[in-house]
């Protein structure tokens, strides 16, 4: 019987690059403008609705598609693809070296709620596009959008990555909700990234917390010793 290799599922935005890049802020502003334009509502109402959909569905676009019949691909072009990532994201050689070292022992997989175009852009500008065995993303062309923290999304990433044993899955994400969802789904190793200066979550959502993605390998050494 073949023993499955452990796999690390990495979130992308605000996880493999720091929040100080403020990409989330730029994205939020574009989403709000898109809401306001497409739905014909004031900016304040658009901001409120964006937050409601994000909290409830994991991604704002799912709420737009479900309740307003918005074209998700048009949303992607107007929001994600309009971000000037090339001016903001810098190549991260330390991260690259860590990932290449990890791949000697683990499968490494991107697991993001972004669309594939945005994900590929981020990986390219970070200089790590060749450091992963695959990528699972939110398919904006799908009839029914699924995203973290929906259980179906965790099922999908395991299926696409070819892993069946939940105890072989190691997941790192900055989102409390996504980490909690993964733990409730049954993944044993769920690691929330909480940057230095941000308060630690109470109660803790996952099995572990790290402050710096570049120190992730040190945590893996601890996990392997458990």
Swiss-Prot record:
Listed NCBIfam families: HAD-SF-IA-v3, Pyr-5-nucltdase
A GO-annotated cellular component: nucleus
Descriptive protein name: Uncharacterized protein C24B11.05
Species assigned in the record: Schizosaccharomyces pombe (strain 972 / ATCC 24843) (Fission yeast)
GO molecular function, one term: nucleotidase activity
Disulfide bridges in this chain: none
Family note: Belongs to the SSM1 family.
Domain of life: Eukaryota
